[in-house]
């Protein structure tokens, strides 16, 4: 049994026999890595980078000294309820086994009826915070550009729950889509930051179950829990948001949450997706800032996926802050990034 099965429970049986897969149109060879450097930052992007450097990074620096303090992580998602979605956006609440989810579609996007395509979006937030509302504008724009409904699980979070609980919730979101009538090659897994980790871990669990989604999309993904490669990365000085100590603090929270989880009488083992890559995973698109620390994770993932013959496309955006797509449409590069991702999703699903 794989490490993922040990950490997240035994692989569940395939939900339905997969149908014959359609040929994809995007021109990526198995094992190929496409690494594209985008244009430099706009004035809006520079202002956002400076703002994050002056406000978010100091706050995370202070918080990293007391990571176990009772910080009000839920405030971010609660406050985000005040953010209005783009006009015409349709949102519907969905009940999953252990959490809720939000089914989102932009104006003119057809309902989720099991036809065409659908995106399972796993939001970021360091496994600690955020949700469907904090990522509402990003998700609505992605729905528009991909011409697809998007399901966003409000998965369980640390420190009360473990990452394995979050993966279980993401699996339940995927299962809901399958019961809705979608085939694996109609479903794209996407996520930003910690959501990138969840998307890759979910794809690995699905592979064990004989299911292969159409594609994986990750924005500024956290794909490796180990801290030293990031705290010693050259970008640690140019990252707008994350001080070195933040990664150590997060790792400690993750480890403690895993130790407290009682899965079949055993505590969780920390799972590193990049140490368990296998052939057969979906092709992957990664968008990442050229000056953030998680550029390390993006390029390491690309190298390792290529060794197991999984096509990878890495788009590097110089001068951007972490998960800059959240600032769309205020930052033009964020809109361009989401438009490219939407096109990739349309091509991946035919």
Where are these regions (language model features)?
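A glycine/proline-hinged amphipathic helix-loop "lid/cap" segment
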Residues: 1-109, 260-262, 350
């Amino acid at each position: 049994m794989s490490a993922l099965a040990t950490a997240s429970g035994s692989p569940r049986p395939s939900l339905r026999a997969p149908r014959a897969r359609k040929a994809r149109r995007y021109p990526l060879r198995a094992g190929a890595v496409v690494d594209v450097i985008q244009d430099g930052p706009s004035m809006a992007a520079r202002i956002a980078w400076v703002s994050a450097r002056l406000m978010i990074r100091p706050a995370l620096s202070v918080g990293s000294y007391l990571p176990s303090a009772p910080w009000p992580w839920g405030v971010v998602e609660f406050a985000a309820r005040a953010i209005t979605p783009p006009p015409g956006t349709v949102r519907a609440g969905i009940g999953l086994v252990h959490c809720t989810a939000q089914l989102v579609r932009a104006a003119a996007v057809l309902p989720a009826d099991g036809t065409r395509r659908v995106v399972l979006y796993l939001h970021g937030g360091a496994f600690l915070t955020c949700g469907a509302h904090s990522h509402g504008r990003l998700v609505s724009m992605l729905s528009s550009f991909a011409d697809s409904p998007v399901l966003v699980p409000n998965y369980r979070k640390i420190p009360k729950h473990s990452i394995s609980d979050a993966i279980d919730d993401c699996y339940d979101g995927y299962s809901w889509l399958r019961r809705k009538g979608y085939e694996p090659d109609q479903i794209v897994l996407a996520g930003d930051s910690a959501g990138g980790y969840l998307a890759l871990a979910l794809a690995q669990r699905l592979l064990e179950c004989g299911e292969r989604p159409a594609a994986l999309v990750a924005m500024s993904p956290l794909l490796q829990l180990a801290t030293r490669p990031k705290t010693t990365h050259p970008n640690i000085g140019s990252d707008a948001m994350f001080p070195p100590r933040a990664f150590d603090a997060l790792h400690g929270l993750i480890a403690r949450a895993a130790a407290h989880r009682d899965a079949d009488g055993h505590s969780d083992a920390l799972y590193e997706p990049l140490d368990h890559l296998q052939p057969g995973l979906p092709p992957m698109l990664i968008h990442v800032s050229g000056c953030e620390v998680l550029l390390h994770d993006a390029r390491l993932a690309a190298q390792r996926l290529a060794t197991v013959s999984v096509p990878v496309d890495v788009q590097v955006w110089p001068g951007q802050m972490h998960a800059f797509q959240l600032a769309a449409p205020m930052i033009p590069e964020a809109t361009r990034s989401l438009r490219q991702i939407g096109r990739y999703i349309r091509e991946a699903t035919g």
